[in-house]
Amino acid sequence: MLNCNSYMGDKNNKKLGLKESISLVVGNMIGAGIFMLPASLAKFGSISIFGWVISGFGAILIALIFKRLSQKFPGKSGPFHYTKEGFGEFLGFFVVWGYWISILLTNAGLAIAITSYSGVLFPILQNNVQSIMFSIFVIIVIAIINNYGIKTAGKFQLVTSILKILPLLLTIVIAFFVFNTDHFIMLNTSGESNFNALTATAALTFFAFMGIESATIPAEGTHNPSKTIPKATMIGSILTICIYLFSSIALMGIISPIELANSTAPFADATGIVLGNIG
């Protein structure tokens, strides 16, 4: 995730364009949530798909708010400035610190997710000590890259966004070959009412939409922010919602509910199932 320090002191020719701004939204939204949530949602059954739809609709509404605010206050950097403009510096102070703490916690979760998936390729990372050290290493490396400036950080964000999207798109593609509709027979397997299951899955999946405001944060380092940021916010949000929904459906069609609930790396397991079937 890009660090706000990397937005300081960059020249105009080093400002972010539309594709980098979109990658900010997509890359920061597609984090630990989508890679780890399918296992948590498996116990609810196929009703979790509707949870994604509900939270996705809520995310679109929030994206529209940020779009409007970025047009009303062009060049102003995200939630802090928006709050300050409307309610004063005192509340703006609390918002910026609350936002910083939330991002700090999110980065920790993302590092854990990266380590969990890396453990599939490197079993040594399944050891507690090695996994902790690797997670810390990931955070340090990203922090160092951020300090090289906004353009470098933007390019890095674009590359990492593509790398995060690829396994999700791969899951959607391979689902065409091994999709099992029997996995969707039971709508609600949680033992709770449909309403309670929907509210629970909507709350869980909404975590995956953190980062929807990302294009607004480096407004001062964005080229033509009044046009670039609104476009990036909406395009990035809609693209991410579609990827979330279709990759989740694909994953549920590949892995049985019981196996999915016990998985520590669902998308890696889905690839393993396909390769096993081919073999």
Placement of each model-derived feature along the sequence:
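Transmembrane helix-loop junctions in multi-pass membrane proteins
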Residues: G33-P38, I145-K151, N180-T181, I278-G279
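Helix-loop-helix junctions that connect adjacent transmembrane segments
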Residues: Y7-N12, S48-I49, L125-S131, L158-G279
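Membrane-interface "cap" regions at the ends of multi-pass membrane proteins
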Residues: M1-A39, F44-I47, A59-K67, G75-K76, ...
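Residue-level recognition of membrane-helix boundary sites in multi-pass small-molecule transporters
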Residues: E20, I47-F50, L91, T152, ...
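Select transmembrane alpha-helical segments in multipass membrane proteins
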Residues: K15-V25, G88-I101, F134-V138, E192-T205, ...
